[in-house]
Amino acid sequence: MRRGSGDAAVADAIERSKTTAARNIPQLPDLPLPEDTANLRLGPDLNNELLAVLPLVGVWRGEGEGHDPDTGDYPFGQQIIVSHNGGNYLKWESQTWVLDADGEYVRPDLHETGFWRISGDGIPGSTNEEVVELLLAHSSGIVELFYGQALTQSSWELATDVVIRSTSGVLVGGAKRLYGIVEGGDLAYVEERIIADGELRPHLSARLSRYVG
């Protein structure tokens, strides 16, 4: 890393927050429930059980690269919304869309929604160590349960424990995901997925900038 690049990244993040700090996800009125918020400055306090995944809260937008075993590599755009209402879970929604070689929209692609949860007592070395859970339902007709752990205060590694496919769902194997907050405060991730030959292969990767929070 070049000298001063860290300071520049912090300065960029501060400048960007002047816009993102005032934003939040839209709400419909007249419900007697705590409002969902993707901005830790607004709405209910984050549940103490979720401190291990606190940096994920926000709305993230950017571009990435996907790999299809049949058609090869392709670029995509993505938005991820991570919100909470004070409960002991984070709400997760991710949508991607295929881009052409010029970065223009082509069609919708992947859509998943679910919840991040934390189990265990958080005591290193105990028999009930802290575990990160991610439960996802996909528009492609599959449901997945990931288990993993926080590698640091701003990175998380997970792997599927269960993959359930509906009658009309796509045929896929298990997956591993690695998420992390990287230089400049962006959210980056990679996903590897088991394909027909039984090997884990690169499937998705992206770097997303904070849009809300």
From Swiss-Prot:
A motif (GXWXGXG) lies at residues 58-64. It catalyses: peroxynitrite = nitrate. Gene3D superfamilies: 2.40.128.20. GO terms for molecular function: heme binding; metal ion binding; peroxynitrite isomerase activity. Binds 1 heme b group per subunit, that coordinates a highly solvent-exposed Fe(III) atom. The keyword Transcription does not apply. Its cofactor is heme b. It is an enzyme of class 5 (isomerase). Its EC number is 5.99.-.-. InterPro entries: Calycin, Nb(III)_bact/plant, Nitrobindin, THAP4-like_heme-bd. Pathway: Nitrogen metabolism. Heme b binds at residues 176, 203. Keywords: Heme, Iron, Isomerase, Metal-binding. CDD domains: lipocalin_heme-bd-THAP4-like. Forms a 10-stranded antiparallel beta-barrel structure able to accommodate a hydrophobic ligand in its interior. In fact, this fold hosts the heme group, which is located in a wide surface cleft. Heme-binding protein able to scavenge peroxynitrite and to protect free L-tyrosine against peroxynitrite-mediated nitration, by acting as a peroxynitrite isomerase that converts peroxynitrite to nitrate. Therefore, this protein likely plays a role in peroxynitrite sensing and in the detoxification of reactive nitrogen and oxygen species (RNS and ROS, respectively). Is able to bind nitric oxide (NO) in vitro, but may act as a sensor of peroxynitrite levels in vivo. Belongs to the nitrobindin family. HAMAP family: nitrobindin. Homodimer. This is Peroxynitrite isomerase 2. It comes from Rhodococcus jostii (strain RHA1).
